[in-house]
A protein has these predicted regions:
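Beta-strand signatures of extracellular beta-sandwich domains
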Residues: 100, 369-373
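Short proline/glycine-enriched turn/loop motifs at strand-loop junctions of beta-rich domains
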Residues: 363-367
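Solvent-exposed, conformationally flexible loop/turn segments
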Residues: 353, 391-392
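Solvent-exposed serine/threonine-rich low-complexity stretches and specific carbohydrate-binding patches
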Residues: 381-388
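Surface-exposed, proline-anchored Ser/Thr-rich loop/turn motifs
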Residues: 335-362, 373-378, 405, 424-427
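Bacterial N-terminal signal peptides
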Residues: 7-16
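C-terminal tail/sorting-segment detector
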Residues: 386, 397, 401-427
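Extracellular zinc-dependent metalloprotease catalytic-domain scaffold
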Residues: 23-184, 189-328
Length: 427
């Protein structure tokens, strides 16, 4: 009975607090945020890794998304390899909005094969979570319109000066780097296989490249004990504690990933933070070079060739928010739409003398923030911020220490919604 009464109370409290939030503002756009693929000579491809067949990935009529590429400086052969990778991705994700890529074939550092990444959007109508950055191509799909018509969704650069490219689509020689495979890797970053947590001067922060706030990818990141890296009670941001987590053991634990692996998957987290490499890739030990999921490890070896992304890569993009098509859909399946909003259950006493607690369950991935305010709306205490998933509740604890007798309100923002829970402190 207490649960039913509380849910009804939340509906009333939420209405009282949601007036300002209901006013729509223009979406924020930033970017691009790039991941860099370096030249690494110590990585060895598995035997036969260069011999994968790379035929037409699907019938053109069966493609799930239209991609439009603006090519700058490409030779005919390099452009053909790039376009083949684009065509593969067009068979694996579904969108009714055109995905636009700006691709440059240009001189880069001798130690760089290429880089790419998405422009980012947050707080647009139609996006599932508030204050979370989404890759522009996905944001367009979720919003049902092009949110930034004058800008590409993905920006990419590849090293035209590098002397050891394999630009054909046949078997990759053992002494060359396969351009098709490198482009396939970088487009995955552009579609959202990229995180927004980073280490700066030994301190972990929620943000990167002068951009603050979490990415959709970050909602699914946790430590070895299952604690979300966005949980500010465990990992304040900025903090050395968050930096230690990002450079030790990080796992991706989305619903789709658990479906295909029955467990979280390890992300690349070397002891020394590697900008553009750490955290935004699969672990290079857990996933063998030359395998389909090895595609999204942080390095590509000479002679390594991959025909398409693997099941884990597909699942990560599904958890970020993509609807899958073709071989990705066949591997991961369809994720049922997450509906039902937010449910809050009082798990501690109310009124209370020393402490009480709430259990928050969200039907969709998002950020949860809880603040305690007094009856005049003045902030009394920050109760924490964390990532919430359908299978990962948010426990809110309120301590009475330092509070006078009276009525207080837990102002709870989850995703794009906002609810309020009145609490009474008695002495």
């Amino acid at each position: 009975m207490r649960r039913a009464a509380l849910v009804a109370l939340l509906a009333l409290g939420g209405a009282a607090l949601s007036g300002a939030a209901a006013q729509t503002a223009p979406p924020e756009t930033r970017g691009p945020v790039r991941c860099v693929l370096p030249v690494v000579e110590t990585r060895a491809a598995a035997p036969g890794a260069g011999r994968r067949a790379r035929g037409a990935p699907c019938d053109p009529a069966e493609r799930g998304a239209a991609f439009e590429v603006t090519y700058m400086g490409f030779s005919a052969e390099a452009q053909a390899a790039f376009q083949a990778a684009v065509d593969t991705w067009s068979c694996l994700v579904r969108s009714d909005q055109t995905v636009r890529i700006a691709a440059e074939w240009t001189g880069l550092s001798a130690t760089t094969l290429g880089s790419a990444g998405p422009r980012l959007v947050r707080n647009a109508d139609g996006l599932p979570a508030r204050d979370v950055w989404y890759p522009a191509a996905l944001a367009d799909q979720l919003a049902g319109r092009d949110l930034e018509p004058k800008a590409p969704d993905v920006e990419a650069s590849f090293n035209s000066d590098f002397p050891a490219w394999h630009v054909g689509l046949g078997p990759t020689p053992p002494d060359q780097f396969d351009l098709y495979t490198v482009v396939l890797h970088e487009i995955a970053h552009g579609l959202g296989f990229v995180g927004g947590l980073s280490v700066e001067d030994g301190v972990g922060v929620v943000g990167r490249d002068d951009l603050r706030g979490p990415f959709a990818y970050d909602l699914h990141a946790e430590d070895a004990f299952g604690t979300p890296l966005l949980d500010t009670r465990a990992y304040p941001a900025p903090s050395a504690r968050l930096a230690a987590a990002l450079t030790s053991s990080v796992w991706f634990s989305g619903r789709a990933v658990r479906r295909v692996r029955n467990a979280p998957v390890a992300l690349y987290a070397p002891a020394r933070w590697l900008p553009g490499g750490s955290y935004s890739h699969l672990d290079d030990v857990a996933f063998e070079p030359g395998s389909r999921d090895g595609l999204m490890s942080p390095f590509v070896a000479r002679g390594e060739a991959v025909d398409r992304p693997g099941d884990v890569t597909c699942a990560v993009l599904a958890d970020v928010g993509w609807t899958l098509a073709g071989a990705c859909r066949a591997a991961v399946g369809d994720l049922a739409p997450e509906r039902g909003g937010v449910e809050v259950v009082q798990t501690g006493p109310n009124p209370f003398r020393s402490r009480t607690s709430l259990r928050v369950v969200s039907a969709a991935p998002g950020l949860a923030r809880a603040v305690l305010v007094d009856v005049r709306g003045r902030r009394v205490a920050d109760l924490g911020t964390t990532a919430v998933l359908p299978e990962r509740p948010f426990e809110v604890v309120v301590e009475a220490a330092g509070l006078a007798t009276g009525v207080y309100v837990v102002d709870l923002r989850v995703g794009a919604g906002r609810v309020a829970v009145p609490l009474t402190v008695v002495r």
